[in-house]
Amino acid sequence: MSEIFDAKAFLKTVTSQPGVYRMYDAGGTVIYVGKAKDLKKRLSSYFRSNLASRKTEALVAQIQHIDVTVTHTETEALLLEHNYIKLYQPRYNVLLRDDKSYPFIFLSGDTHPRLAMHRGAKHAKGEYFGPFPNGYAVRETLALLQKIFPIRQCENSVYRNRSRPCLQYQIGRCLGPCVAGLVSEEEYAQQVEYVRLFLSGKDDQVLTQLIARMEKASQDLAFEEAARIRDQIQAVRRVTEKQFVSNAGDDLDVIGVAFDAGMACVHVLFIRQGKVLGSRSYFPKVPGGTELGEVVETFVGQFYLQGSQMRTLPGEILLDFNLSDKTLLADSLSELAGRRIHVQTKPRGDRARYLKLARTNAATALITKLSQQSTITQRLTALAAVLKLPAIKRMECFDISHTMGEQTVASCVVFDANGPLRAEYRRYNIAGITPGDDYAAMNQVLRRRYGKAIEESKIPDVILIDGGKGQLAQAKAVFAELDVPWDKHRPLLLGVAKGADRKAGLEILFFEPEGEGFSLPPDSPALHVIQHIRDESHDHAIGGHRKKRAKVKNTSTLETIEGVGPKRRQMLLKYMGGLQGLRNASVEEIAKVPGISQGLAEKIFWSLKH
């Protein structure tokens, strides 16, 4: 227990109502967030003589201050707890590190609806189907739907400005609602309804309706139409035969857990309308000494409550373990969803098979992760030995990318003991330098990155500078001039230059910008981790540069046209679906864009043609 923190005096002020508490260390950092039905009773348990675990002992020893927020209900406390955990990321809480929103398939509410992938808040008018485990699953499904039910997938800006059908219509992947007379309103609406039923898992209804239409077409001697519908029926059957089908109508998430060597894997199996859509493995950050029960309970709460606005909640959640807050979690989710959500532990019968599958996947993913972790650990240990450091907990690497000195972008990638920390990757747009001056670009990015206060845990042990002696000299100069509150002498600056023929494995390393460098054997684990972080930095820089270059390319030509300012430029690109669509447009099509006169349309047309 901290001598500074007076627990007895504090506990006298605490209420017995439900609420949330935040524990702070001497530096004012939130180190733990918790909730309680009875705040006084719960907080008193931390200051007993016989604490339950070493983790709790370590936590209590660092407490200097505790804040309490009283809530009306326990459900309110549960929601607030997970909001605080997401906000503060306390080191003694189990943390769900993967907070990406799930992708959905979006069927718009337009006159002629379109299909698209969607992530994030659901503001647009239309229907959302999912969630899908990743973007790849959505793109695969969209490609499949395009072959079976040819409704449009183009942006509205393209759709509204077409005078003739595009290539998708020519190859039978779209019915061409953008051009009058190509498809009737009834036929298009029918195909949209098929998509709606198909994505809702009602394949049988789709087949029944298609078969009825095929038979009617045959009776009416419309044999070409009957053959087209027959092909559509066969395509639907081919797809549905490949899908694993559970009990009809099942709409649930199945959660299995594996725990070993201080690392946990939580595997979530997504089942919607009786079909397994996919799955995803999560590896929450687990503080030392944490019990499996706490890992599971915290993960489930964070998974559903923190991301509730981005996630479609299932009707039921299956768990293969007991949950002390099961009723509270079910009530909270039901309140959020506006309908009853059931949380079931250890089900029997057919559903037990899903739990076994989720458990098996969790165990397999954990074995793979531990193997990768072992490799990363070995490589970092080897590099620490080469650099004569006790350990490497954090590395950062910088790279510069540009085309003939234009659109210069610098990247910074971060590795910790677990490998890449992609959430902390950063790009910096470089300005105010002589085009092509990589040294000045490196100087600028390092000053922007390190010329400010940095948390102790964010100070890198090693900073890799891609580019060799010259770039390393810039880094040394920057650090010599830094006036910052953190220990600027802690990071080891290391230059990395490509060797002869610029081949991997021939890299030359420099501690100083003068003198000879040194090389590592091609099979050296230390070299492999250097190559890994350098390649990540290179790819990140190039990706940022390409985005910046594309943005400039889309606007630079229009900027030279008199009468086309920023607002008109934006309107043109929006309605034409980009610069290429504008280049291909006729004068009449350009004139349809709001704010563009016939005369200005002609000027734009001829400027782009020449």
Curated annotation (Swiss-Prot):
CDD domains: GIY-YIG_UvrC_Cho
Domain UVR: 204-239
Residue ranges crossing the lipid bilayer per the database entry: none
Gene Ontology MF: a single term: DNA binding
This protein's record includes keyword DNA repair: yes
Pfam families per record: GIY-YIG, HHH_5, UVR, UvrC_RNaseH, UvrC_RNaseH_dom
One CC-aspect GO term: cytoplasm
InterPro entries in the record: GIY-YIG_endonuc (IPR000305), GIY-YIG_endonuc_sf (IPR035901), GIY-YIG_UvrC_Cho (IPR047296), Hlx-hairpin-Hlx_DNA-bd_motif (IPR003583), RuvA_2-like (IPR010994), UVR_dom (IPR001943), UVR_dom_sf (IPR036876), UvrABC_protein_C (IPR050066)
Protein name: UvrABC system protein C
